[in-house]
């Protein structure tokens, strides 16, 4: 785990960057001609303390969107069959909905769909928030919610929601639920700008653009650097960061 990244000597003339990191209880340091910081934006100011104050402030702007992906294993999906549905949208409940997983198709592998008497996985999604607050404050409240919520609360809410949605189809949680897996993501997804809450910055002046500016032999790449929570954006930022170092032979 990297703990400190700094230029060896003055940033303007440094020929190397030193990275201090920990592994198995010991601390090590390694030097390189260029470094790409690909961690979360909000962690970078703590790791690279020499960054300009304005850049640190920009890196702290975004707040990760907390998420919960819950998977419920059912012994059968007779209740879905009887109701003639594959999922239920419920934006006012603890999870915003539930839906049966589609059979996987990976490479040459093709899962064989089972009948209503066969087991099935059901996916649920929750985005903890606090309505009425600005979006970043809602995300912070969501972080706290995920850190303090017990599994018992999740289980009771899930069982209740399944009964409300599938009870008319004969669903019985004590009989039909085989297992529950709750994947909590307090760190969640990269913050994306919203015109309801965020200013309309001129080109080049948004926090993600200021935050990802090259600093000597250090560049920055991650989905936060694009203010977009998608793999393609992270790849684009990685390409940019490497090119910034390669274009002037820094590496």
Predicted regions mapped to residue ranges:
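Extracellular/periplasmic catalytic domains that process cell-envelope and extracellular macromolecules
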Residues: 12-13, 29-30, 63-65, 115-118, ...
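Secondary-structure transition/capping motifs at alpha-helix termini
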Residues: 11-12, 25-27, 54, 248-251
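A conserved short coil-to-beta-strand element within the FAD-binding core of flavoproteins
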Residues: 1-18
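C-terminal substrate/ligand-recognition segments
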Residues: 2-5, 32-33, 40, 120, ...
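Glycine-rich loop(s) and the adjacent beta-strand/alpha-helix scaffold that form part
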Residues: 17-92
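Generic beta-strand/beta-sheet core signal
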Residues: 1, 8, 37-38, 221
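Conserved flavin/dinucleotide-binding core of flavoenzymes
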Residues: 22, 73, 79-251
């Amino acid at each position: 785990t990297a703990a400190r990244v700094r230029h060896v000597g003055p940033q303007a003339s440094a020929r190397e960057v030193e990275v201090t990191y920990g592994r198995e209880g010991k601390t090590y340091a390694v030097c390189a001609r260029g470094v790409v910081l690909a961690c979360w934006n909000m962690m970078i100011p703590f790791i690279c303390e020499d960054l300009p104050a304005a850049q640190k402030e920009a890196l702290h702007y975004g707040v990760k969107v907390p998420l919960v992906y819950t998977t419920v294993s059912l012994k059968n999906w007779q209740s879905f069959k009887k109701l003639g549905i594959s999922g239920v949208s419920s934006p006012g409940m603890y999870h915003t909905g539930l839906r049966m997983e589609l059979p996987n198709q990976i490479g040459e592998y093709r899962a064989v769909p089972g009948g209503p008497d066969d087991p099935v996985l059901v996916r649920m999604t929750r985005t903890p928030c606090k309505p009425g607050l600005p979006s970043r404050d809602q995300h912070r409240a969501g972080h706290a919610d995920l850190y303090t919520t017990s599994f018992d609360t999740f289980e009771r809410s899930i069982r209740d929601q399944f009964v409300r949605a599938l009870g008319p189809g004969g669903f019985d949680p004590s009989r039909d639920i085989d297992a529950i897996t709750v994947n909590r993501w307090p760190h969640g997804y990269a913050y994306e700008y919203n015109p309801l809450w965020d200013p309309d910055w001129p080109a080049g002046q948004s926090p993600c653009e200021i935050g990802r500016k090259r600093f000597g032999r250090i560049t920055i790449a991650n989905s936060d650097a694009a203010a977009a929570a998608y793999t393609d954006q992270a790849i684009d930022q990685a390409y940019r960061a490497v090119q910034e170092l390669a274009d002037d032979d820094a590496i």
